[in-house]
Amino acid sequence: MLIPSKLSRPVRLDHTVVRERLLAKLSGANNFRLALITSPAGYGKTTLISQWAAGKNDIGWYSLDEGDNQQERFASYLIAAMQQATNGHCAICETMAQKRQYASLTSLFAQLFIELAEWHSPLYLVIDDYHLITNPVIHESMRFFIRHQPENLTLVVLSRNLPQLGIANLRVRDQLLEIGSQQLAFTHQEAKQFFDCRLSSPIEAAESSRICDDVSGWATALQLIALSARQNTHSAHKSARRLAGINASHLSDYLVDEVLDNVDLATRHFLLKSAILRSMNDALINRVTGEENGQMRLEEIERQGLFLQRMDDTGEWFCYHPLFGNFLRQRCQWELAAELPEIHRAAAESWMAQGFPSEAIHHALAAGDALMLRDILLNHAWSLFNHSELSLLEESLKALPWDSLLENPQLVLLQAWLMQSQHRYGEVNTLLARAEHEIKDIREGTMHAEFNALRAQVAINDGNPDEAERLAKLALEELPPGWFYSRIVATSVLGEVLHCKGELTRSLALMQQTEQMARQHDVWHYALWSLIQQSEILFAQGFLQTAWETQEKAFQLINEQHLEQLPMHEFLVRIRAQLLWAWARLDEAEASARSGIEVLSSYQPQQQLQCLAMLIQCSLARGDLDNARSQLNRLENLLGNGKYHSDWISNANKVRVIYWQMTGDKAAAANWLRHTAKPEFANNHFLQGQWRNIARAQILLGEFEPAEIVLEELNENARSLRLMSDLNRNLLLLNQLYWQAGRKSDAQRVLLDALKLANRTGFISHFVIEGEAMAQQLRQLIQLNTLPELEQHRAQRILREINQHHRHKFAHFDENFVERLLNHPEVPELIRTSPLTQREWQVLGLIYSGYSNEQIAGELEVAATTIKTHIRNLYQKLGVAHRQAAVQHAQKLLKMMGYGV
């Protein structure tokens, strides 16, 4: 729960001086990106902005405290303040913030600005006490906020110092409105107004001016002088002389003498006890101070001018002026040291009664009460964990003695899940092993099963599927039906293990079961994970259309539950990119891969390896080797600076080896082949992929025999495990092996198998990347006119893609080529004596590329009858009677010119 007072603008108090000159300056705040109010404590920053905000509706207010350095807490309150300003317009951001479903503050702010694009009237967001922020991530995120905020939004920041928000740049661009301590200092006229409404007997204007000068217009000093003058008989000027030259850091003695020593003992204790509360209401005051009429007491303290201010329009929430509050907390530690733990315990109990466990934990920690802290955690820790209050939980668990954790194994489990969420896998097992060693009878029963479920998740994350399977099965055997979270975890792990082992049908069933349980219990990240796994399994089985439909369900879940910022979102858009690439929808595949990189923009660059490999695949399919090389440089740098799952390494190696194949870089392939891992098995798609990489490198090096052994074994495994997409890929690589080895009939046989299987998978780009060798074989098959209709159509589509994205074959017959051809000593005499026109050379190139008459007409944008005329003329000039003879003639010319066809 969010504390309402932190989101409430302070109420404009009676007897305050209206700062007309400053309000006039602030009236143009909507013309600036940032309004910055800076001064030391006590200059009236908050009072000024509360006066300016009075009557404004489209304004959000966020009062900071020390706890707001936690990113998740900062995000929750800031978005809540924006919701306040827009009357609930930013619903998606609110859900994302509440459920912690965002990758970073910047990505959350980006979503906020998308929602605000539809809001056209002026908006204001006030952040008070920004000097309390010390987290550099928040500073950087707020710089992003200011750079990208909509033109109609003005950020108003109140701070005791100059915040790290790129102020200089804003100042240069005239996007900054500044009010500093010199402007905030009271003028003589404002000081006179102040004393006139605070003192029963007015003072002369000259006296008021002298007092104002003595304290340099410092508002807090003027307030202290007025308070002292009311409580004592000495003059205001005498108090002013005492305060002259004193600043906020030297006020303690003065406040003791002039404030605390001039109130009765009951009021003194009330001030000291209540000061431990960052915000307070009637119930908190009753419990912490023991006074029955807390609201009345707070209003009385406010009337006495003891630096207490209302935090909301209802008047229910109060807080002390920061300067006075800090002073009181320090005095409380000195004067009430013995009582302080009990005071904090009372505060914790009251916060708990009002439903604010995080505030209660703050006081339980301050009280040093391990038992209270334990009880709060036992009741609320998992809720805080699910809301990503990880820093607070970690601090709390560290404060508990080990014996307390052993007495409450669920807290050990919580600590282990915290470690798991931070990828500290080794520490998880160490912690659980130690707990099991020391807790009696823990090695059986429900808690042991929950330990095993977590251990199983750690094992699969750490690349140990056999151990993960053993632990997941043990957990499922021992977990009661009602322990849904651990059952979801164990079922998901078991499904992933079966996926790794190639048992795709069983794995798919378990992932569908995981999805059903996760949806039933609102465990959305596991629901998303299970859908992603289902899609991968269906892709491996060759059911790409069903995989697509499963991905659509996952995208729908992301939209409904606002999971866009989860790292798993990148996984989904990446496998969508892989599917689009397979279908030769390269522009969409590239856009999807880039969106995956955007999701991971706040993470380490190593996390982007997979999407980067996908971008390289797109470049390779287009034949854009320059771009591929540039991206490969970055990929190889990432490979050398990180530790990756075998699946990631396999995908990275794939694009490297294909690039070497396309560029004929045998040295790089040979060096890689000497050092790359040779997996023991090939029973899943990523192990198949790595062995395929090895075979491709061997083919490039002319090592046909070992490559054939590898590919035949891969095919045997793929057929037995029904890894149909891998079988399709393997057949294509085997085709290249046979073609290069001169075994043309074998090459044609496996190519026909690959084309037939592609009717199921829909593969296009897997054929395209094999380039001219594939194009030549497809041209021959098309000319034979013996392919079934579906295979014929696919072959023509693949050929068009090769011609579009790779070097156009008719480009061999451009003007430069024709000139060199005609000057070649071996050119046929018929070509010399009856030269073709440039258009006829282009038509010959397209015939050689396998284009039909209609396709040639479309390519050259002329009528089909015109193409027939060109074909008749070139046949006559070449001395050929039919299309196949023209193809053979073109092939001879290309070979003569040194082209490897």
Swiss-Prot record:
Any matching Pfam family: TPR_MalT
Binding site for ATP: S39, P40, A41, G42, Y43, G44, K45, T46
SUPFAM superfamilies: C-terminal effector domain of the bipartite response regulators, P-loop containing nucleoside triphosphate hydrolases, TPR-like
Regulation: Activated by ATP and maltotriose, which are both required for DNA binding.
Keyword Protein biosynthesis annotated: no
Family per similarity comment: Belongs to the MalT family.
PANTHER family, sorted: DNA-BINDING TRANSCRIPTIONAL ACTIVATOR DEVR_DOSR
Name listed for the protein in its UniProt record: HTH-type transcriptional regulator MalT
Organism of provenance: Escherichia coli O127:H6 (strain E2348/69 / EPEC)
